């Protein structure tokens, strides 16, 4: 994969390296995807991903969490920021020409309702892009695989549950599960691919433990890295580059979906602004 931007450097200087590493891979996928306006970002969070990924303005960023969405203002990437639940969007039917939801749906208990509502506010034929972890996420965790190899199956199961919990995952489902959800909402999958190999996942997994200094820096100084400069992260960029430049893998822990809104669905009558 080639890119005009060095997404790896851009992300890891702004985030803990394990998160920035993954986001850099995902940013590159969008370079070849069409996002006609008006664009909806479902679960925009603090806006960092969109600010680093897209050159164009995003029309609307939507997120239910008060703190992160107010942080998103600093990037001036969104024309409008809306604090609202994704299952009850305050927009008319067929308003948006495209939508994305980057590493969001796996955290939402009512993912089906969010998909249904996203379909409602999209125009027929509009693209919708999203990425989520799949069952390989828990199966490929290095510590759990070690316990499997030495016969401690109960320890492996407990670790997988623990890591999924700290990752705040509600869903790590296969493409056929998402295909059923999408069909119910009124989407058709055009294509999908797995990415993030077992070795890349191990790098992310151990980053949760080695990233404690970044968390301390964030708490004390309001930033993940005290010196976010190329000279300070060049060694880390070199270490991660082999994974970032070749992210596709049949046993990848994450899946990226390219879908199309293919039919009109009935909008829930009780939507409202959430303040």
What positions do the PLM features span?
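Active-site micro-motifs of SAM-dependent methyltransferase domains
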Residues: 88, 106, 137
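Residue-level "edge-of-site" marker
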Residues: 85, 104, 195-196
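A short SAM/SAH-binding and catalytic strip from SAM-dependent methyltransferases
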Residues: 98-109
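S-adenosyl-L-methionine-dependent methyltransferase catalytic module, highlighting the catalytic core
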Residues: 112-117, 127-258, 270
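Glycine/Thr-rich phosphate-binding loops of Rossmann-like dinucleotide-binding domains
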Residues: 49-50, 109, 138-139
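Helix-to-beta-strand junctions that scaffold the AdoMet/dcAdoMet cofactor pocket
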Residues: 108-109, 122-124
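Conserved N-terminal segment of class I S-adenosyl-L-methionine
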Residues: 1-92, 98-100, 115, 249-257, ...
């Amino acid at each position: 994969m080639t890119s005009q931007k060095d997404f790896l450097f851009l992300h890891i200087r702004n985030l803990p390296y394990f998160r920035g590493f993954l986001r850099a891979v995902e940013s590159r996928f969008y370079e070849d995807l069409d996002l006609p306006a008006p664009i909806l970002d479902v679960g925009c969070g603090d806006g960092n991903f969109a600010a680093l990924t897209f050159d164009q303005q995003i029309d609307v960023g939507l997120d239910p969490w008060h703190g992160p969405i107010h942080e998103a203002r600093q990037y001036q990437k969104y024309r409008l920021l809306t604090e609202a639940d994704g299952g009850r969007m305050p927009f008319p039917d067929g308003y948006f020409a495209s939508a994305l939801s980057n590493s969001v749906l796996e955290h939402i208990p009512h993912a089906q309702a969010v998909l249904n509502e996203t379909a409602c506010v999209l125009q027929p034929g509009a693209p919708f892009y999203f990425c989520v972890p799949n069952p390989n996420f828990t199966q490929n965790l290095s510590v759990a695989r070690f316990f499997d190899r030495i016969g401690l199956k109960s320890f492996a199961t407990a670790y997988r549950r623990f890591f999924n919990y700290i990752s705040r995952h509600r869903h790590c489902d296969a493409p056929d599960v998402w295909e059923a959800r999408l069909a119910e909402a009124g989407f058709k999958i055009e294509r999908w691919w797995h990415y993030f190999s077992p070795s890349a996942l191990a790098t992310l997994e151990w980053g949760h433990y080695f990233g404690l200094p970044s968390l301390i820096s964030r708490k004390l100084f309001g930033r993940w890295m005290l010196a976010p400069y190329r000279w300070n992260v060049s060694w880390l960029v070199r270490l991660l580059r082999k994974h970032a430049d070749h992210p596709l893998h049949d046993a990848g822990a994450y899946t990226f979906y390219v879908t199309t809104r293919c039919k009109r669905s009935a909008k829930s009558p009780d939507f409202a602004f959430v303040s």
